[in-house]
Structures are given as C-alpha cells and as structure tokens.
Amino acid sequence: MPLKQTITHNLLNIPGWHTNRKIVVIESDDWGSVRMPSREVYEEFLRRGVRVDWDPYCRYDSLATADDLSALFDVLISVKDKNGRHAVLTADTVVANPVFEKIKASDFREYFYEPFTETLKRSPRYDGAWELWQQGMDAGIFHPQLHGREHLNVKKWLRTLQSGEEVTRLSFDLGTFGLTSAVDPRIKNNYMGAFNSGLDEDIAEYDTIITEGQQLFEKLFGYKSESFIATTYTWSPKIEPSLIRNGVRYLQGMVHQKMPLDDDTTFKYKKDNFCGHSSKAGLTY
C-alpha cells in the first residue's frame, strides 16, 4: 500500500475504537448470491458482445462449490492464534435469489425468490456445497452474517425488465441480474444496491425485505444475525429501526455511507461511521 494511503487509513482510524489487542478481521461479502451462474453463461455473454471480462465481479463472483469451500477451510485451519484458535471468516450472506421462471411467467410484474440453498440445487456443480457450509459453521471457522435478502434492487430491476431493455433481458434469460454499465453502455441502471432509495414507499418495502431476510437467515443458520452490512454501502437511516426490530445490533461497513435521498438519483455522503461509534438509531458501527 502506498505511504500516502497508509497514512490516510491510519488517520481515519483515530476517532474510532482502540485496543492494544492484535486483531485480524477476515470478512467477505456476497455469499449466496448469483452473479455469474456458470462458465457457459460467461462465454455466452462474450459471444453476444457483452464484455463481462471487463468487470472483476462478473469474472470471479459465483456461488462457491464444495471444492471452493474445502480449499478455503484448509487455509483457515492452517493457522492459529496465540490461544490456539483457528482463523474465522465472517461470510456476509444474501439468503435468497430470484426465481427467474416464475418472474417471467408473471410478465415481469411480480417478484419471487428462493433460499440460496435451493439455488444450489439447480446445478450439480454445487453438490455438497451446503453440507460444507454447515461443516464450516460447526467447526467454528465460517460464520455467516446478514448482507440482505438478495443483492438486488427488486423494484428497479422489474421496471427495467418490463421496459424490454435488451441487455437486462438477455442477462435475465441467462439467469443473472448482476451486470452494470461497466460491461455494456446500454445498461443504464445498476441493480445491485438493494436499499438505494430514500422514498417512504420504498422504505416500507425495505422493512418487509429486512424482516423476511432475517427470518430466512435464522431458518437457514439457526440464529439471528446480530450484524448487517448494506449492499454497495448504500442505505437510508430510515431502515435502521427495521434492522433493530429484527435483532440487528451492529452495522458492518466502511467509514463512509452513501445515503439515498430519493429513488436512486440523489445521495448524501456520510463519512464519520467510525468503529465503536453509534448511529442516531442506536446501531454500533
């Protein structure tokens, strides 16, 4: 890391929580989400002239196979701290994905979702993957926390699908939603920010999404997630009471927060979410 960047990072940490303990935090987002369904879909996008190779998320972000998880767990158990404990990965998880065939049958007017564990069953390449999730949790080296119900702005996505926009419809037909203008200029909307609105009508819908997401999380993992990290670090403070009602106590993320003021066009930037401080609603950063 360049010296200037190192100094900047250290300065940002000064107002936050401090400890003399040597703590290493390992966390990773987007577990459970369909971004690139398969190598075959990736190659089909390229064949159609959609440059998914320009976006690292499209190139590398996919559901983890049993082999992927085994390799990860091998690394985690290869090291121990001074107390003899193995490394632990916090897996920030979206618990659901769209059910494409049902959405299409509704002429793109209704949204349906399924637990990501059902998505895993749709391809033999994920055989045994869910069992590895459970083994990692049982071993205490893999700890999911809530990233959202799905990594998707449902309202915006359905609206664009109804309009017939070419690349978004193509990606839908290929079983994904995670393309941005980085891969094709015809894409005018980014659907990855699940909470990218500050409108009251959308906040009410987000309350449902958060509640259903936490309920599904508890059903899958056997406990409620105490922390939450918003997709794309974007959320309105208006959703925080819903998080609290659903058992969330902590907000993961960066020092900065992108706060939508309307329907995903105007934003305010908050840059003081320091570790150990609290939001106005009472959640701890």
What annotation goes with each model-predicted range?
Residues 2-227, 233-282:
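Catalytic alpha-helical scaffold of carbohydrate-active enzymes acting on polysaccharides/glycoconjugates
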